[in-house]
C-alpha cells in the first residue's frame, strides 16, 4: 500500500483528535457560544483570541458542514479569529458579509469554490483588493464554479493581486481578455483554466518565464489548431506540470503529437493526458525516458497504461485503469472531476468484485468521490456498487467505524436524492444490509428507516423486499418509542409490513422475508402504544391468528408472532381487543408448547391480561382461574434456556405485574423473565433494573407475607445478583436507556 494511502487508512482508524472534537462541537452548537449583533450576525461571547491554525480549521470545518452564511461568518469579524488560509467552499454569503468577515485578515490562501451566486469573482477580488497586505501577499486563490461578474461590461481586477502565485478558475465563463490580464501577474506560477470559455491560449506567452504549472482540462471552446497549441506550450520552458486531459469528447490528436515532441518541456515532472485519444504505451514510455525526472503521468480513459513500465507502483505515479494502484491514484487526483471519478469507479468495481482483503484506503477515496458529486447519478451509481464490494460480508468488520459512518451517511443521501432509480436504491440497500453497519456504526437510524420504508412502499422486488425488511427489523429496535410512533404515522409502515405477512401467509411460504417482517413488526411495537394501535386498526390481530394457525410447527414464526402480541398485551388501552375467546384459547394451547420460547411468550400474554383483575376479564371466570393454574405450572416446568431469548428496552412493563400478590402465576412469569435476562446479560440488565427502581419492587416481594415461595425464591436470587453487581461495579448512575435489537 502506498505510504500516503496507508496514512489515510490509519487516520480513519484512529480516534478523532481533541481539536477536531472541540471544533465539531463548537460548529454544531454555535448558538450556545455566540450572541447576535444588531444586524443578526453572530459573534463569540468569550473575548479570547484563537490561534491562527485553529481559526483556519474552524472555518474549514464550518465550510465542510455547510454552515457558512451571512450570520455565521460574523464570528470571523474583528481580531478574535486570525485567518491565514481561508476555506469558504459552498458558502451562502453576500459580498458585504464576505468583505466584513474576511478581507481584514492577512490571508495568503483563499478557496472560494462554489460559493453561491449572490457573490461574484469581481466582488471577491474587489474585497481582497481593499486590503493592501492581501494585494501583495495573497499567494493562492481558488475561484472555481463561480460567476465572473453580473455586470456587462465589467471591470477587470485581477491585476490588483500583484502577489498572486497560484490561481484556479475552473468552470467559469472566463475569456481570452481575462486570461491576458491574469498572465500579466508578475509572480504567477500556477494556473488552472479548465472548462473555461478561452478560445486562444497565446496570452500565456506573457508569463512563459514564470509559469511552472498549467492545467487546461476540457478547454471545450479552444479554436487553435494542434500545431498552434504546441507552439505556445513549447515556449513554456519552465513548466513542471501540464494537464491537457479531456472528458473523451474530442478526437484531437494533441496528446499523441505532444508525446512525440523531443524538444519540448525539458523540466516537466508531471503530465496528464487522461481522456485523450490516440495515446499509446510506446509513445508515453518514449516521452518519459527522455525526461527521467518525470514523477506522474495521467492515463485514465486512454488506451495506455498497461505496460510493465507504467504500472504506477514505483517512483513514477500513474493514474489509469489497469490496476488498483492506478485507479487509486486517479480517484485521489480527480476527486473534483465527475467524469473521471465515474471512470475510475467503473474500473474499481470490476477489481473489487472478488476482493478478499479489507481496503479502507480505497473506500476512503470512494467516499470522497461520492461526497464531491452528490447529485451526479453515474458517480453515485458506480460508487454505491463499489461500496458494497468493499464492505460486504466480513470485509466491513475490518473497516474503521468512522469511515463506515461517512459512507453510510452518503448512501442514505444517495437514496434520498434518487428515490426512483431502482439500481441505485438496490446498491444502497445491499450495502446497508450489514450487521456491522446496522449494529456498530453511528448514523441517523430514523432517517434511514424512513428511506428504506419509502422504498418498500414503492417497490415489489422480492429479493430487495427481503433486505429492506431485514434492515427495518434491526433499525426499529434502535429507535425511540417516539420515533417508531412517528414512523408508523408518517409512512403507514405497519400496514405495509402486514401486507407482506398476508401475502406470505396466503402463499403458505415460510421464508426469510416473512421472518424479517415479523421481527420488524415485533420491534416496532415494542413499548410503542401508538404503533400497537396501528397494528390492531389494520386487522393485525386477525392476521396473526391466521399465521399461528397456518404454521403450527414453525416455532421461530410462533415466537415472533407471540412476541409482538406480548407488546399488544402490555398496552392497557388495547386490553379489550384481546378479550376474544378464540384468541385466548389458541394462546392457552401454546402455553403448553414443548418449545420454551413459544411457551414463554404465550405465558407473557396471559400474565398481562390476567394482571388487570377480574373486572377487566370479560370472558369466563373459570377459564381465567384455569389459566392462572396452567400459567404457574407451565413456568415451573421450563428448563433454563442456553441463550438469551429476548431483549428488552426497559423493565417498566414488568413492574405492574410484580405487585399482583393475589395472582402468583403473573408474578412468577415476571420474575422468571427478569432473572432470565439478568443472568444472560448482567452488565446490561442488572444496571437497567437498578436504575429503573427494580430493587424496591423485589424487596417488596421478598418481604411480603403472602408471596408465593417460588416467586420469592427467584426474587431473592435476582436480588443476590444485583447486590453482587453493585459490589463489582458500583451503583450505576441514571442514564438514557439505549434500545436494543431483539434476538430473533
UniProtKB/Swiss-Prot annotation:
Changing residue 570 to A: Complete loss of N-degron binding. It is found in: Cytoplasm. Keywords: Cytoplasm, Host-virus interaction, Leucine-rich repeat, Repeat, Ubl conjugation, Ubl conjugation pathway. GO terms for cellular component: Cul2-RING ubiquitin ligase complex; cytoplasm. (Microbial infection) Ubiquitinated; leading to proteasomal degradation in the presence of herpes simplex virus 1/HHV-1. Changing residue 523 to A: Complete loss of N-degron binding. It comes from the Eukaryota. The keyword Flavoprotein does not apply. Pfam families: LRR_Zer-1, ZER1-like_2nd. Serves as substrate adapter subunit in the E3 ubiquitin ligase complex ZYG11B-CUL2-Elongin BC. Acts to target substrates bearing N-terminal degrons for proteasomal degradation with the first four residues of substrates being the key recognition elements. Prefers Nt-Gly but also has the capacity to recognize Nt-Ser, -Ala and -Cys. Involved in the clearance of proteolytic fragments generated by caspase cleavage during apoptosis since N-terminal glycine degrons are strongly enriched at caspase cleavage sites. Belongs to the zyg-11 family. This is Protein zyg-11 homolog B. It comes from Homo sapiens. The lineage of its organism: Eukaryota, Metazoa, Chordata, Craniata, Vertebrata.
Amino acid at each position: 500500500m502506498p505510504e500516503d494511502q496507508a496514512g489515510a487508512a490509519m487516520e480513519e482508524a484512529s480516534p478523532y483528535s481533541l481539536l477536531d472534537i472541540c471544533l465539531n462541537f463548537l460548529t454544531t452548537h454555535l448558538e450556545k457560544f455566540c450572541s447576535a449583533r444588531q444586524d443578526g450576525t453572530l459573534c463569540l461571547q468569550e473575548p479570547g483570541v484563537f490561534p491562527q491554525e485553529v481559526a483556519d480549521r474552524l472555518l474549514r470545518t464550518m465550510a465542510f458542514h455547510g454552515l457558512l452564511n451571512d450570520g455565521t461568518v460574523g464570528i470571523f469579524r474583528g481580531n478574535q479569529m486570525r485567518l491565514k488560509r481561508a476555506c469558504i467552499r459552498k458558502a451562502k454569503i453576500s459580498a458585504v458579509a464576505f468583505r466584513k468577515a474576511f478581507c481584514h485578515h492577512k490571508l495568503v490562501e483563499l478557496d472560494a469554490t462554489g460559493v453561491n451566486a449572490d457573490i461574484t469573482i469581481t466582488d471577491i477580488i474587489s474585497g481582497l483588493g481593499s486590503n493592501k497586505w492581501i494585494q501583495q501577499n495573497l499567494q493562492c486563490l481558488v475561484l472555481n464554479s463561480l460567476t465572473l461578474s453580473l455586470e456587462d461590461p465589467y471591470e477587470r481586477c485581477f491585476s490588483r493581486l500583484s502577489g498572486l502565485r497560484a490561481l484556479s478558475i475552473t468552470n467559469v465563463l472566463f475569456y481570452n481578455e481575462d486570461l491576458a490580464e491574469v498572465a500579466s501577474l508578475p509572480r504567477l506560477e500556477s494556473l488552472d483554466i479548465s472548462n473555461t470559455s478561452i478560445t486562444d491560449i497565446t496570452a500565456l506567452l506573457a508569463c512563459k518565464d514564470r509559469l511552472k504549472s498549467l492545467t487546461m482540462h476540457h478547454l471545450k471552446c479552444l479554436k487553435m489548431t494542434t500545431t498552434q497549441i504546441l507552439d505556445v506550450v513549447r515556449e513554456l520552458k519552465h513548466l513542471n506540470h501540464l494537464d491537457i486531459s479531456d472528458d473523451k469528447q474530442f478526437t484531437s490528436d494533441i496528446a499523441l503529437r505532444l508525446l512525440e515532441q523531443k524538444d519540448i518541456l525539458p523540466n516537466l515532472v508531471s503530465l496528464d493526458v487522461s481522456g485523450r485519444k490516440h495515446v499509446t504505451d510506446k509513445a508515453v514510455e518514449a516521452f518519459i525516458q527522455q525526461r527521467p525526472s518525470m514523477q506522474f503521468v495521467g492515463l485514465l480513459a486512454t488506451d495506455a497504461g498497461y505496460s510493465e513500465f507504467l504500472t504506477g507502483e514505483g517512483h513514477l505515479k500513474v493514474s489509469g485503469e489497469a490496476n488498483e494502484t492506478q485507479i487509486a491514484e486517479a480517484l485521489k487526483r480527480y476527486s473534483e472531476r465527475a467524469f473521471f471519478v465515474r471512470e475510475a469507479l467503473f474500473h474499481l468495481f470490476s477489481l473489487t468484485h472478488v476482493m478478499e482483503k479489507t481496503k479502507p484506503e480505497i473506500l476512503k477515496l470512494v467516499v470522497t468521490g461520492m461526497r464531491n458529486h452528490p447529485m451526479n447519478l453515474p458517480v453515485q451509481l458506480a460508487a454505491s456498487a463499489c461500496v458494497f464490494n468493499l464492505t460486504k460480508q466480513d470485509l466491513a468488520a475490518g473497516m474503521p467505524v468512522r469511515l463506515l459512518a461517512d459512507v453510510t451517511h452518503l448512501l442514505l443521501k444517495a437514496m434520498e436524492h434518487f428515490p426512483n432509480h431502482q439500481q441505485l436504491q438496490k446498491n444502497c440497500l445491499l450495502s446497508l444490509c450489514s450487521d456491522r453497519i446496522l449494529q456498530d456504526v453511528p448514523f441517523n437510524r430514523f432517517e434511514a428507516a424512513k428511506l428504506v420504508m419509502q422504498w418498500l412502499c414503492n417497490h415489489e422486488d422480492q429479493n430487495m423486499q427481503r433486505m429492506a425488511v431485514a434492515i427495518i427489523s434491526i433499525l426499529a429496535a434502535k429507535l425511540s418509542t417516539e420515533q417508531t410512533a412517528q414512523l408508523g404515522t408518517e409512512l403507514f409502515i405497519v400496514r405495509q409490513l402486514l401486507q407482506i405477512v398476508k401475502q406470505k401467509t396466503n402463499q403458505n411460504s415460510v421464508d426469510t422475508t416473512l421472518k424479517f417482517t415479523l421481527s420488524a413488526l415485533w420491534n416496532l411495537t415494542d413499548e410503542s402504544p401508538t404503533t400497537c394501535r396501528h397494528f390492531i386498526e389494520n386487522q393485525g390481530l386477525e392476521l396473526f391468528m391466521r399465521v399461528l394457525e397456518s404454521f403450527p410447527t414453525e416455532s421461530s414464526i410462533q415466537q415472533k408472532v407471540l412476541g409482538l402480541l406480548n407488546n399488544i398485551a402490555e398496552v392497557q388501552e388495547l386490553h379489550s381487543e384481546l378479550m376474544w375467546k378464540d384468541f385466548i384459547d389458541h394462546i392457552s394451547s401454546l402455553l403448553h408448547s414443548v418449545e420454551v420460547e413459544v411457551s414463554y411468550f404465550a405465558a407473557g400474554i396471559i400474565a398481562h391480561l390476567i394482571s388487570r383483575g377480574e373486572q377487566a376479564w370479560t370472558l369466563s371466570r373459570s377459564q381465567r382461574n384455569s389459566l392462572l393454574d396452567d400459567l404457574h405450572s407451565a413456568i415451573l416446568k421450563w428448563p433454563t434456556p442456553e441463550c438469551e431469548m429476548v431483549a428488552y428496552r426497559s423493565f417498566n412493563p414488568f413492574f405492574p405485574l410484580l405487585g399482583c400478590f393475589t395472582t402468583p402465576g403473573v408474578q412468577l412469569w415476571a420474575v422468571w423473565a427478569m432473572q432470565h435476562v439478568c443472568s444472560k446479560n448482567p452488565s446490561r440488565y442488572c444496571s437497567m433494573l437498578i436504575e429503573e427502581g427494580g430493587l424496591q419492587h423485589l424487596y417488596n416481594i421478598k418481604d411480603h407475607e403472602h408471596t408465593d415461595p417460588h416467586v420469592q425464591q427467584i426474587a431473592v436470587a435476582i436480588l443476590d445478583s444485583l447486590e453482587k453487581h453493585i459490589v463489582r461495579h458500583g451503583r450505576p448512575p441514571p442514564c438514557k436507556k439505549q434500545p436494543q435489537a431483539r434476538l430473533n
